[in-house]
């Protein structure tokens, strides 16, 4: 997977990924993203401000996320819990989505781990809808810990991960052509 900043000519592909994610959430009975948000304007702003990232598989937009660095007002208003560490600067992931073509293949976990490894600083935060058990499970697999609730679109569950120095994933993507290196030819 190639992970990089999104380009303006990818807006339509990214919006399509977000629309597919919205439909998936609706079909799963999850009331997250069932209004106008997220939309093309959000993606456009993300790209112009240098915080929109894509994960590409075979040149196709497979995943998207907005990466914010700094404090966020809603995150400062955490309740029914507290952050494990109160770092003044942290990284948050928003609008995390994958396309239907790559759903269920571990793309989001790989994408988020790659983003974590590529960002400076140890403090990573993310929020999700209480009903979004898939995202909650992915965050926990990545080492995030539930910390409380934040006032975003009513209420969202807030998670935090403290990255260990030089953290690298426990898995490695192996190109099909390189499988012989593992003695599986």
Language model: regions and residue ranges:
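A short beta-loop-alpha structural element at the N-terminal edge
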Residues: 2-16
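Conserved GNAT-fold acetyl-CoA-binding loop/helix
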Residues: 22-42
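Conserved beta-hairpin
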Residues: 49-68
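Conserved acyl-donor/pantetheine-binding loop and adjacent beta-alpha core of acyl/acetyltransferases
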Residues: 66-97, 103
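Conserved acetyl-CoA-binding loop-helix of GNAT-fold acetyltransferases
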Residues: 98, 104-117, 137, 141
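Conserved GNAT acetyl-CoA-binding A-motif
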Residues: 112, 118-130
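Conserved active-site alpha-helix within GNAT-family acetyltransferase domains
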Residues: 130-148
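C-terminal "cap" of GNAT-fold acetyltransferases
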Residues: 152-185
């Amino acid at each position: 997977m190639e992970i990089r900043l999104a380009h303006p000519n990818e807006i339509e592909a990214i919006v399509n990924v977000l629309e597919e994610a919205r439909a998936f959430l609706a079909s799963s009975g999850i009331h997250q993203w069932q209004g106008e948000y997220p939309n093309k304007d959000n993606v456009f702003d993300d790209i112009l401000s240098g915080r929109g990232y894509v994960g590409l598989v075979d040149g196709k937009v497979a995943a998207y996320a907005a990466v914010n660095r700094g404090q966020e007002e809603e995150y400062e208003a955490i309740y029914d819990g507290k952050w494990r560490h109160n770092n003044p600067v942290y990284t948050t992931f928003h609008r995390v989505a994958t396309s239907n073509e790559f759903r269920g293949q571990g793309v989001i976990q790989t994408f988020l781990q790659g983003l974590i490894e590529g960002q400076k600083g140890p403090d990573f935060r993310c929020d999700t809808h209480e009903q979004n058990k898939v995202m909650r499970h992915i965050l926990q697999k990545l080492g995030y810990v539930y910390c409380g609730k934040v006032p975003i679109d009513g209420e969202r569950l807030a998670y935090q991960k403290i990255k260990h120095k030089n953290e690298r994933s426990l898995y490695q993507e192996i190109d099909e052509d390189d499988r012989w290196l593992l003695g599986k030819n």
